[in-house]
Curated annotation (Swiss-Prot):
NADP(+) binds at G179, T180, G181, E182, M183, G184. This is Glutamyl-tRNA reductase. Gene3D superfamilies: Glutamyl-tRNA reductase, N-terminal domain (3.30.460.30), NAD(P)-binding Rossmann-like Domain (3.40.50.720). Possesses an unusual extended V-shaped dimeric structure with each monomer consisting of three distinct domains arranged along a curved 'spinal' alpha-helix. The N-terminal catalytic domain specifically recognizes the glutamate moiety of the substrate. The second domain is the NADPH-binding domain, and the third C-terminal domain is responsible for dimerization. The record marks H89 as: Important for activity. During catalysis, the active site Cys acts as a nucleophile attacking the alpha-carbonyl group of tRNA-bound glutamate with the formation of a thioester intermediate between enzyme and glutamate, and the concomitant release of tRNA(Glu). The thioester intermediate is finally reduced by direct hydride transfer from NADPH, to form the product GSA.
Length: 424
């Protein structure tokens, strides 16, 4: 079976594999809805996936057009996958093979959320919707057959492991979690088993902080009291969705003045792990004496005792995804052919109705029976005339021969451009 696609599909991506936190911040799209609106004018379908360690743009369109669009957006440095390679990359994403923490589950929810946003803005066409749903299904199945997501496998849990490595143990420590979104929930869940003395949860919306704090027997913190609780904390893990830094140099320096406890022989170090994107903590906070600032870039070095198991499980996942790719291409091409055929049949139906009405107008005074027979006759003739064409286009789809199919449609329509190539 060929790996050619019947319609163009492209992914442009930047991730932790090739870029630092700062690099990803420079190309991030702060207003996702505005981006999708602009992209929707260029492509039949578009998905924007932005997480703490990757930005992926998936389009029903070709790589050259996507490259031109990104240049117009002032964004450069993207890695491109096109057609079958793009489908393969999407499967890797959904299965967690491309994640910083191999096998993590969060990517599935992030893909669903991205698709939902595109659907709500009417920029997810049937083909790109098929791609995301198929990838999510394959990713879920890959985890089921391999167990690759066994153990502590999330950016949130990796942040907790990093803090634990720096302090030796989190038992008896005071931890402040800033943010109550999906990542904040994962962080607090990972902390719940660490025998902490106290866990504080801060969020811009205090009710959400209270809700999460209650689940882990912690203390909700109003944002107005953030730096007072910073003074009492050994570790701060930051994971808000704020578009600007929340923890700033001057305020941290002030808070540190009251940080020593009466029985401390020396000033306790403050560990800050910033896993937000864009960053929650001003970069210069890491230069303050007594503060150790870590970002997503540092999570690559975390010693996770389940990593070796997941690496071995990844081999099983790879075999499964290789098989899934063949089916994925078949589904993709079938859906693309359906779209082309729907356009062709719609064009033919318009001609049928026009010619039927013209014939009936020449049969002045005809009764309903004549009208019904004429309608049936034109309908049957149209269907029969398109039968062989339909079969040929489906065969072209199986082979990924889009150009042959479009040339055939062009011959039938005498060059009338019923299949807009704007997105090719």
């Amino acid at each position: 079976m060929t790996h050619a696609l019947f319609s163009p599909f492209t992914i442009a991506g930047i991730s932790h594999h090739t870029a630092s936190v700062a690099d990803m911040e420079s190309v991030r799209f702060p207003d996702e809805e505005a981006f999708l609106t602009r992209a929707g004018d260029w492509f039949k379908g578009v998905i924007l996936l932005q997480t703490c360690n990757r930005i992926e743009i998936m389009v029903h369109g070709n790589a050259d057009l996507l490259g031109t669009f990104l240049e117009s957006e002032g964004r450069a440095g993207w890695q491109m996958w096109k057609d079958a390679d793009a489908l393969s990359h999407l499967l890797d994403l959904a299965a967690g093979l491309d994640s910083m923490v191999i096998g993590e589950d969060q990517i599935l929810g992030q893909l669903r959320k991205s698709l939902s946003l595109s659907e709500s803005m009417s920029v997810a066409d049937p083909l790109i919707t098929l791609c995301i749903n198929k990838a999510i299904h394959a990713g879920s199945e890959a985890r089921r057959i391999s167990g690759i997501n066994r153990g502590a496998v999330s950016i949130g849990s990796a942040a907790v492991l990093l803090a634990e490595e720096q302090l030796g143990s989190l038992a008896g420590r005071h931890i402040l979690v800033l943010g109550t979104g999906e990542m904040g929930v994962l962080v607090t869940q990972a902390l719940a088993a660490k025998q902490l003395s106290a866990i504080y949860v801060a969020n811009r919306t205090f009710d959400r902080a209270q809700c999460l704090a209650e689940k882990v027997h912690g203390t909700a913190v109003p944002m107005a009291d953030l730096y007072r609780y910073l003074t009492m904390s050994d570790v701060i893990i930051c994971c808000t969705a704020a578009p600007h830094p929340v923890i700033k140099v001057q305020e941290v320096m002030e808070a540190l003045k009251g940080r020593s406890w009466p029985l401390d022989h020396s000033r306790r170090p403050l560990i800050i792990v910033d896993i937000a994107q864009p960053r929650d903590v001003e970069e210069d906070v890491g230069k303050i004496p007594g503060v150790c600032l870590y970002t997503i870039d540092d999570l690559r070095k975390v010693n996770d005792d389940t990593a070796q198991f997941r690496k071995e499980a990844a081999e099983k996942v790879r075999e499964f995804l290789d098989q899934e790719l063949v089916q994925f291409i078949r589904l993709f091409n079938r859906k693309a052919a359906d779209e082309l055929l729907a356009t062709l049949h719609s064009w033919a139906e318009q001609i049928r109705i026009r010619e039927r009405d013209r014939a009936l107008s020449r049969l002045s005074g005809c009764d309903d029976r004549v009208r019904d027979v004429t309608d049936d006759l034109t309908r049957v003739l149209t269907r029969k005339l398109l039968t062989d064409v339909t079969l040929t286009i489906r065969t072209c789809a199986e082979r990924g021969e889009m150009k042959i199919a479009e040339d055939l449609v062009g011959a039938i329509t005498r060059g009338e451009n019923i299949c807009s190539r704007t997105y090719d």
